[in-house]
Amino acid sequence: MFEYIKGELTELTPALAVVEAAGVGYAINISLNTYSAIQGKKDVRLFIHEALSAGGRDDSFTLYGFATKKERELYRLL
């Protein structure tokens, strides 16, 4: 399980951040709140929530990133 990913922000949209850490680019789904918090930054740390969807051939592993632990905790309560 990942606690956070820290690295260079290489791509950013209001819904997705790509963070390069140790030569790997992680595509991380983000909230608009996180987008506002990291916009304009070169290096970021995103607190991660992992989601695994198992559906036969459509299995997926999705990362959700948050600028703060508090925002991640709130998301997990939903």
Model-derived segments and their meaning:
Residues 7-9:
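Conserved hydrophobic positions within beta-strands
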Residues 11-78:
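Long, highly charged, low-complexity intrinsically disordered interaction regions
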Residues 1-5:
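Short coil-to-beta-strand transition motifs
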